[in-house]
């Protein structure tokens, strides 16, 4: 847990595990047991990096507007910078906007997309989430219970572990009493389960379970779109990845491009690399049907405003064409 105001100044602990599932935050919950698992960690916070952080920040002006004289007050709570940052920033309070690249939410809070959002991941990337009280049932449990829940290998345990580890990046500090993962190899398995479930859901033609339908009524699965095929290839590469040690440097993942597909299996206009060392990944614009780079669109660490470089009236994202194939 990070030190609060009023406590003695302590060096920040090493950055938490940077979850591999950041790009798949909005994917449907997956099930199934995990096989091979690898843990990915942020680079350690060296004394040089900590020394470069400077003095603790103060609350923003809006938070102290009611204070007489407008004096800048210390933050109500200090949290680490987004991603793998080592310095302290003011935590976001309940009801404040949050996202992947914004300061984390305070203790007991998490960053959630708005209910009913069709693209929850995109909302979090754009900083359009909201800091709300944690919804998971294990919050407030004893450290022993939390640790036991964290080691659960059931379907719910896998999903909850993913949400917890991901929200440690987006929300408040993690559970101080949580035991370290015994195998040190859970994140990659959860990632594969999530990606598999994501494109499995995109490939479904209906809401009925196969086991409840007559065999004669079953239809062959629709053809995989280029974006879904690329997801398959990424899964295959990760499943055969052999790392020099169980820590798995983040650079191994950063070299992989995980395609951002929409609910129809087409490419989203904006594609981005993962963040690394607290630095926002590059983003670029692609054709939603082919995934190819749109000529003239920039590649920047921010929003390239892809809608300005793609004529939707001409191609209309090819949704009807894809459905007819």
Curated annotation (Swiss-Prot):
Domain Thyroglobulin type-1 residues, every copy: 224-306
Protein localization: Secreted
Motif position, Cell attachment site: 301-303
PTM comment, free text: Cleaved by MMP9 leading to release of free IGF2 from IGFBP2-IGF2 complex, which contributes to enhance the motility and the growth of astrocytes.
GO molecular function: insulin-like growth factor I binding; insulin-like growth factor II binding; protein phosphatase inhibitor activity; receptor ligand inhibitor activity; signaling receptor binding; signaling receptor inhibitor activity
Subunit architecture: Interacts with IGF1. Interacts with IGF2. Interacts (via RGD motif) with integrin alpha5/ITGA5; this interaction induces cell migration, adhesion or apoptosis according to the context. Interacts with PTPRB; this interaction leads to PTPRB dimerization and inactivation.
Domain remark text: The C-terminus is required for IGF-binding and growth inhibition.
Record-given protein name: Insulin-like growth factor-binding protein 2
Source organism: Homo sapiens
Gene of this entry: IGFBP2
